[in-house]
From Swiss-Prot:
Its main location: plastid. GO terms for molecular function: rRNA binding; structural constituent of ribosome. Residues 1-72 form a transit peptide. The gene is RPL1. Keywords: Chloroplast, Plastid, Ribonucleoprotein, Ribosomal protein, RNA-binding, rRNA-binding, Transit peptide. Residues 82-113 are annotated as: Disordered. GO terms for cellular component: chloroplast; large ribosomal subunit. Gene3D superfamilies: 3.30.190.20, 3.40.50.790. It comes from the Eukaryota. This is Large ribosomal subunit protein uL1c. Transmembrane segments: none annotated. Component of the chloroplast ribosome (chloro-ribosome), a dedicated translation machinery responsible for the synthesis of chloroplast genome-encoded proteins, including proteins of the transcription and translation machinery and components of the photosynthetic apparatus. NCBIfam families: rplA_bact. It comes from Spinacia oleracea.
Amino acid sequence: MATAAPPSLSLCYASSSFQYQQDPSFQTHFKPLLLNSSLCRLTLNQRERSCLKWVDFTSQKQSPKSVSFRVLAAVAAEAEVADMEEEEGESGGVATLPSPTKPKKGKAALPLKSDRTRSKRFLEIQKLREIKQEYDLKTALSLMKQMSSTKFVETAEAHFRLNIDPKYNDQQLRATVSLPKGTGKTVKIAVLAQGDKIDEAKAAGADIVGGEELIEQIKGGFMDFDKLIATSDMMAKVASLGRILGPRGLMPTPKAGTVTPNVAQAVEEFKKGKVEFRVDKTGIVHIPFGKLNFEEEDLLINLFATIKSVETNKPTGAKGVYWKSAHISSSMGPSIRLNIREMLDYKPPSNA
């Protein structure tokens, strides 16, 4: 007895259109494929067991025997088909593969500070203070001096995180502060001037004084100075040094007090301890305020002067809370967090 031929189907390549030609009650149920799968020609097999997870064809006719078909799509050997329908069913999303992670380069590839190996010296001195504790100015300075263990005299540094964004002109901060007790180091000053200003600069204690000949020396690579001061009438010629002095932070500017008609006063101020500071792109100001061999009272006076200068020169575009955090540290030591309220309310002694 001849058996009846199975119903015919019309199939195509990697397509979502399957057409049953004879029985309209024939239903298809599609399940997601990986996006990087490559399909070959589809083959049709008649099986009595359950279908695979790609495409199911089931006849809904009321017949004694249900007819099930399984359509098997051949994929590349390396492709793995994942059952994502249950995960994406509720949200109705489409299953996608995560994009491959690109390897990090440069500073981004470095481990986090918490994952780096600290020296034994650093780990020992770090135990002297609590990490999240906020200290008043006097206690913080005392701890900073206790945690100094290097073979050289470290610099005391203040680090203030401010609620400003320097990419906006009205939120930039660049100013100077005169430290009453000095910086603790010798500053070598060069002056660009002409005429009588040259004699005034030499009398005030400038280390290097010159005019156009000094400009030519700087173009030739001469950089043996820490600060460059220029008179206003020399700025047209100094402009040609922008590419050389700018990246080093030595370009004279009025905001820094290095472009002035009174060169003698400027030389004296920088010799005594005038420090220039500016906010970096992350909104943090870094200011040195002395050496660790200073007395605590002298460091306190200098630190108070830096705080007052940052507060006085608050940008006009700063909004909300201006001070976000404040820390002090030595050059090679851990930072000590300051209590901002006590820091701003501190009143120096009248004899300071």
